[in-house]
Every structure is written in C-alpha cells, then in structure tokens.
UniProtKB/Swiss-Prot annotation:
InterPro entries: Ribosomal_eS30. One of its GO terms (molecular function) is mRNA binding. Residues 1-38 are annotated as: Disordered. It comes from the Eukaryota. The keyword Ribonucleoprotein applies. Pfam families: Ribosomal_S30. This is Small ribosomal subunit protein eS30z/eS30y/eS30x. The keyword Ribonucleoprotein applies. Belongs to the eukaryotic ribosomal protein eS30 family. Keywords: Ribonucleoprotein, Ribosomal protein. Disulfide bonds: none annotated. Residues 25-38 have a biased composition (Basic residues). One of its GO terms (cellular component) is cytosolic small ribosomal subunit.
Length: 62
C-alpha cells in the first residue's frame, strides 16, 4: 500500500476554515447553437493573430 500524506483527522481542514461566501446571481449562459457560436467567436474571430507567446483562454493579459 502507498503512504498517505498526513493523517485523515486533518481532512477538510482548509475548506472548513474558509469563510462562506454567498453565490452571486449571474446572467444565464447561452445553450446549444448559441453557445457554439459564442465559442467560435471567442476562439477564432476575435483572437488577434500576433507574434510571441500563445496565451490561454483564461489569461488576463492584454
């Protein structure tokens, strides 16, 4: 058997410590064809073809 990192008595320690934050109301996301359209626009249409390092979809850099 492999070793366990730490005892199971400490399981869930961090999640238990973090303060509860209420979920916020958000706009509904488009479904089906409309969502595919959104994805296509995000990935291919508005993407600027430039030189340098490729940035991921979650990048906040401009």
């Amino acid at each position: 058997m492999g070793k366990v990192h730490g005892s199971l008595a400490r399981a869930g320690k961090v999640r238990g410590q973090t303060p509860k934050v209420a979920k916020q109301d958000k706009k509904k996301k488009p479904r089906g064809r409309a969502h595919k359209r959104l994805q296509h626009n995000r990935r291919f249409v508005t993407a600027v073809v430039g030189f340098g390092k490729k940035r991921g979809p979650n990048s906040s850099e401009k």
